Amino acid sequence: MQTQLTRFVGFSIFSLIFLHACSLVPSKKQSKLVWNKDLPVIGSQSSPRTADLNNDGTLDIVIGAGKNEYQESDMGILAFDGKSGELLWKQKCRDQVFGSATFCDANGDKIKDVFIGGRSPQLKAIDGKTGALLWEYNAIRYVNDPILRFAQFNFNNSVLVADQNNDGVDDILTVNGGNSYAAPYSQQGRMPGVLMVLDAKTGNVIAADTMPDGKESYMTPVYFSQPGSDEKYIVFGTGGETIDGNLYISTLRDLLSKKLTAAKIIATEKGHGFIAPPTIADVTGDGQLDIIAITHGSKALAIDGKDHHVIWTKTFPGTECSNSFAPGYFTDDDVPDFFTFISKGQWPNSTGSIQVLINGKDGSISYMDSIGCTGYSSPVVYDLDNDGRDEAIISINNFDCSLGYASKPPRTMENRLVYINFAKRSTKTIDQSQGFKNIFSTPWIGDLDNDGYLDVVYCQYYHHSDLLSFLGMRMRRVDLPVRVRKNILWGEYMGSNANGVFSPNTAKF
């Protein structure tokens, strides 16, 4: 194993200097690989998120991980030093931890703690400084509870909500659902998803309710308020890859009162559900946040935030989508647009990836391409060349896409980290690695060390005979010669504030 791992370490970044050579921005330095961390055996379906855990002024990286599905590992949740890439701490898991971290100082030590979930069902709070377990959700405790007895499956990503029990700490909103043993198209064994609020200090459940339609849920809930309003809204979804679903809007008040039956259906889909979390952004220019979603059946919708009428729709027949939209100012107006990629065919016989940019104003297609094979990471966004129009950074896999995920494995595999310049309709490579793949992890971009330049942190996974199995992984930090001149609006999975809300006034700089 070690021979195979070390074999590929020097195999990358043939084009890391391209950013300097093409003079994206005036710069005093070239791109450089700051560090590379190899980890044998394990892999990840999580995405990196950052917080300064050792109080050294540089953001550190947390990611969920594990071995293959249903396997235990002592490397289930990992924290890496942002300066060196060395492991700060690790937490064990009994199954894959595929969620991405939520940060909140729950123990009052001035260092943000980590909340993260995964399969079987796992939801943990971890001391951000030491890696010690603060609390863990215990499903056995609730086997006789009329609602929580259904929360025995996957914990997806969580988001912070305002303090609900007056202990001075924000609390956790999350969803549990999705029975991996349920057969496709069958309703048997598909328990209702459970939306819940937990005390961030103790893990006690403050409130919970089942999905109004009784269906499963895989979607991370999105929590927001409209400008000028104190009402707190929750958008959540139901259904799966082969099961009908609905998109709902409700209020935190209704969840706290166990009245999710009062939630309003704002979209529905037959034969597919809502899996990717929606993006919240103003596309009408009325100052109110709208809801932009895409179903697993690749029907994109913009829904008005005031009265919930459908503003526009766009459907992509013969494709599927589990990837979130990344919003940005990609076209020549001041209305945010929405970029993602969708998969040709039907899982597991997906035969390629289509990159799609939807104009936020009217739902028209502003850009479309087909590079690489199917993957389930999401884009991140920044104006790399400082021309006033954003670019998107994505991870793609190159292999024989016609093989899909169910047939014999591809003999060769290449992972590329690329950026798309929509104004010039060009794609450029940031990093390229033979023998690696990335099926799930979204990159992170931001100023990790506060030096005024953009960093990118991303994961790659050693190619295995089974595309979805793990053989080991590596995490890499590259320092780009791109000055951070403006707010980073969408620099990680679900945005730079990790909540799915596109808000230029609250983005990270």
Where are these regions (language model features)?
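Beta-propeller-forming repeat regions
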Residues: 22-509
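Bacterial Sec-dependent N-terminal signal peptides
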Residues: 1-29
